[in-house]
């Protein structure tokens, strides 16, 4: 068949072989699409590692906030840290309060988990419910959760302990806050630093 093409076009066989690949690529719409996709992906891989130029983006992240000193919070005190009233975002999980400000895209006012900002998210995370109805305004003892829900909550707590700064605990009504010294570090964070 190649010999027939040579005879039909009157071209030298070496010219067809060298131009054949390019001819195939540029005459087939599918090949053009695949070539474009490869070029786009290569561009994203090479360009993706470079940070966006500052000042060009509307989504500029605010400068990082200083680390919050350890302290305990009542549910009412925690509500202030929702990313709107205060730029810092705190969430309570299983009685522990975490600073999730660096996860603003997830836990900020416009994020998918924004409903939990400044709140005790334990019940919502344990039951996979992202509605405000899953949240209580007062301390939630979580005693009515099933064993599976408690295990799910424990998994969430482990993830948050690993990823975010643990800043204190959520206080029950009438419970006195713990007085933390400036040098004191929680055990889980010192263990993380030794790894």
Swiss-Prot record:
Superkingdom, taxonomy of origin: Eukaryota
Residue sites binding heme per the record: 113
Region of interest called Disordered, as start-end residue ranges on this chain: 173-195
Pfam families given in the database record: Cyt-b5
GO biological process: one example: heme biosynthetic process
Principal cellular location given in the protein's record: membrane
Family classification: Belongs to the cytochrome b5 family. MAPR subfamily.
Xref: SMART domains: Cyt-b5
Subunit record text: Homodimer. Forms stable homodimer through hydrophobic heme-heme stacking interactions. Interacts with FECH; the interaction results in decreased FECH activity. Interacts with EGFR, CYP1A1 and CYP3A4; the interactions require PGRMC1 homodimerization. Interacts with TMEM97 and LDLR; the interaction increases LDL internalization.
Name of the molecule in the record: Membrane-associated progesterone receptor component 1
Modified residues (Phosphothreonine): 74
The organism of origin for this protein: Pongo abelii (Sumatran orangutan)
Transmembrane segments: 25-43
Residue list for modification Phosphoserine: 54, 57, 181
Side of membrane Lumenal, spans: 1-24
């Amino acid at each position: 068949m190649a010999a027939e093409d040579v005879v039909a076009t009157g071209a030298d066989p070496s010219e067809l072989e060298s131009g054949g690949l390019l001819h195939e690529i540029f005459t087939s719409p599918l090949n053009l699409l695949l070539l474009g996709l490869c070029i786009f992906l290569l561009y994203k891989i090479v360009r993706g590692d470079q940070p966006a130029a500052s000042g060009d983006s509307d989504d500029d992240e605010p400068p990082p906030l200083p680390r919050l000193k350890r302290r305990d919070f009542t549910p009412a005190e925690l509500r202030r840290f929702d990313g709107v009233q205060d730029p810092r975002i705190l969430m309570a999980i299983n009685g522990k309060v975490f600073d999730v400000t660096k996860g603003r895209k997830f836990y900020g006012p416009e994020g998918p988990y924004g409903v939990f900002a400044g709140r005790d998210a334990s019940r919502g995370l344990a039951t996979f419910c992202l509605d405000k109805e899953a949240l209580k305004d007062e301390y939630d003892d979580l005693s009515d959760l099933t064993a599976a829900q408690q295990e799910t909550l424990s998994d969430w707590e482990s993830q948050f302990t690993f990823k975010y700064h643990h800043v204190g605990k959520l206080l029950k009504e009438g419970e006195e806050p713990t007085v933390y010294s400036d040098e004191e570090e929680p055990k889980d964070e010192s263990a993380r630093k030794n790894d």
